[in-house]
A protein has these predicted regions:
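A general structural signal for well-ordered alpha-helical segments in protein cores
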Residues: 16, 20, 48, 52, ...
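A non-catalytic, amphipathic alpha-helix used as a structural packing/dimerization or gating element
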Residues: 18, 22, 50, 83, ...
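Flexible C-terminal active-site loop/helix
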Residues: 227-262
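Conserved short secondary-structure transition element at the edge of the structured enzyme core
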Residues: 161-164, 201-236
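Catalytic alpha/beta core domains of metabolic enzymes, predominantly
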Residues: 87-91, 102-210
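Active-site beta->alpha loop and helix N-cap motifs at the rims of alpha/beta catalytic domains
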Residues: 1-108
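Structural signal for hydrophobic packing residues in well-ordered secondary-structure cores
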Residues: 24-31, 121, 143, 184-191, ...
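Flexible, glycine/charged-enriched surface loops at secondary-structure junctions
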Residues: 196, 212-215, 259-262
Length: 262
């Protein structure tokens, strides 16, 4: 929770902690098979460590998904990322998951960097939100065997799983979880045609709630599913009526139309 889609960057520190506390209270104490992951990441190593420690003292979190720093992008080299994440992992009381989101940050965690960081026992995985399948395959090849390589891009869920990713952390999973699960099951059971067919249905929705209409698009889709989506924070804008109709069409293509609500 509180990764890119959770608008972490739009929350102040008190709001950030309150959201994590509320989610933890709703989930309850460590349900079997569930990993409670909180998004984290400031522009400095020190800031990120302090953030992780503050949350860990207040809430039981199983792992932190830590986005790359990016403001001083020309200076954020791969070596700088290695030092950054190693220091965070040394200080974190719970495991760390790397988060590579180059579309938003302009910073990519290269396969060789992921491999180097996978040597740290407290760094347990990476969420790769790019659609670079060659890079994903190379990462899987280079990291340690028990290192979790996850896709964060719903438009390539089938392809990423087929390439060897062990799962995904997906915005589209908030509104089409059953389809995502069925793609996972189809890939793991060798039903490649079924997985491909399901992906064809999922991709337009995955695009609609991310790159096309952004976080506002996802919130609109949540409302259509009967949840409270709410508004995005300025300067982000709410989707237009035309955009909402497109989102509804994409949503209905993944499930019976009667499940989508106005």
């Amino acid at each position: 929770m509180l990764g890119s889609t959770g608008e972490r960057v739009h929350l102040d520190e008190n709001e950030y902690l309150k959201v994590i506390e509320a989610a933890r209270a709703e989930v309850g104490p460590r349900p079997e098979g569930l990993t409670f992951i909180a998004g984290a990441g400031q522009q400095s190593t020190r800031g990120t460590i302090n953030e992780i420690k503050r949350v860990s003292e207040a809430v039981t979190v199983d792992a932190f998904l830590v986005i790359t720093p990016h403001f001083y992008r020309p200076s954020i080299t791969q070596q700088a990322l290695i030092a950054h994440y190693q220091s965070i992992a040394d200080a974190s009381p719970v495991p760390v998951i790397l988060y590579s989101m180059p579309a938003l940050t302009g910073i990519k965690i290269e396969p060789e960097t992921a491999a180097r960081l996978s040597e740290h026992e407290n760094i347990v995985g990476i969420k790769d939100s790019s659609a670079d399948l060659d890079g994903l395959r190379e990462t899987i090849k280079l990291v340690r065997k028990d290192f979790a390589v996850l896709t964060g891009n719903g438009t390539v869920l089938n392809q990423a799983l087929s390439a060897g990713a062990c799962g995904g952390i997906l915005a589209v999973g908030c509104v089409a979880p059953a389809v995502c699960i069925e793609i996972f099951r189809a890939v793991t059971s060798g039903e490649s045609e079924r997985a491909s067919s399901l992906q064809t249905k999922l991709t337009p929705l995955a695009q609609a709630v991310t790159t096309r209409f952004g976080i506002g698009g996802l919130k609109a889709a949540l409302e259509m599913k009967g949840y409270v989506g709410g508004s995005v924070r300025a300067p982000l804008a709410q989707p237009s009526d035309e955009a909402r109709e497109e989102i509804r069409f994409c949503l209905n293509a993944t499930q019976p139309a009667e499940q989508a609500k106005a």
